[in-house]
């Protein structure tokens, strides 16, 4: 029987700013059975995409992606915020509501031709996904899918990356 994960995601009004509804996944993470079930669903998706490696953007992508990689016996590649990785890196920038940020991966993190699935907690505007896709492709890999706990379809992230196969456990329309 499929789990309705939306029952376990807390909605916090006006966080971090007024007018925002923050979707909090920590109730899932705090329950071992739910965390395992969510991980398994994302792992089944990654397996269906014939992934060779899992990428997770900092920071919650680590929490989501590492157990997926472990379940599948695959490697995990962190996409880090700037100046956190010790060796030579590839960098890609993305826009935020007020400004921009960047993600970095070690230049040898993705091997040419590797099939990559990105795992993260939430897809909103797809800025992080776009930057990660750019990094993966610049390193010679192919982004074959992206898996999220939560998707906010009204922010049109899918439309910005129509060539990326996207899977999400829960979709929240509206606020």
Swiss-Prot record:
SUPFAM superfamilies: PRTase-like. Its main location: cytoplasm. InterPro entries: Ade_phspho_trans, PRibTrfase_dom, PRTase-like, UPRTase/APRTase. Its EC number is 2.4.2.7. It catalyses: AMP + diphosphate = 5-phospho-alpha-D-ribose 1-diphosphate + adenine. It comes from the Bacteria. The keyword Membrane does not apply. Keywords: Cytoplasm, Glycosyltransferase, Purine salvage, Transferase. Pathway: Purine metabolism; AMP biosynthesis via salvage pathway; AMP from adenine: step 1/1. CDD domains: PRTases_typeI. It is an enzyme of class 2 (transferase). It is found in: Cytoplasm. It holds the Pfam family Pribosyltran. PANTHER family: ADENINE PHOSPHORIBOSYLTRANSFERASE. Homodimer. Belongs to the purine/pyrimidine phosphoribosyltransferase family. This is Adenine phosphoribosyltransferase. It comes from Lactobacillus acidophilus (strain ATCC 700396 / NCK56 / N2 / NCFM). The lineage of its organism: Bacteria, Bacillati, Bacillota, Bacilli, Lactobacillales.
């Amino acid at each position: 029987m499929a789990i309705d994960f939306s029952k376990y995601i807390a909605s916090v009004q006006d966080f971090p700013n007024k007018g925002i509804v923050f979707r909090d996944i920590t109730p899932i993470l705090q329950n071992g059975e739910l965390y395992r079930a969510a991980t398994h669903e994302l792992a089944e998706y990654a397996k269906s995409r014939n992934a060779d490696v899992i990428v997770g953007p900092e920071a919650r992508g680590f929490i989501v992606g590492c157990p997926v990689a472990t379940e599948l016996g695959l490697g995990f590649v962190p996409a880090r915020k700037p100046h956190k990785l010790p060796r030579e890196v590839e960098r890609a920038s993305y826009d935020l509501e007020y400004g921009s940020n960047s993600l970095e991966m070690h230049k040898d993190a993705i091997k040419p031709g590797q099939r990559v699935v990105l795992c993260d907690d939430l897809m909103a505007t797809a800025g992080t996904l776009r930057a990660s896709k750019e990094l993966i492709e610049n390193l010679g890999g192919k982004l074959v899918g992206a898996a999220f706990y939560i998707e906010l379809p009204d922010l049109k992230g899918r439309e910005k990356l129509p060539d990326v196969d996207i899977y999400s456990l829960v979709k929240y329309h509206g606020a």
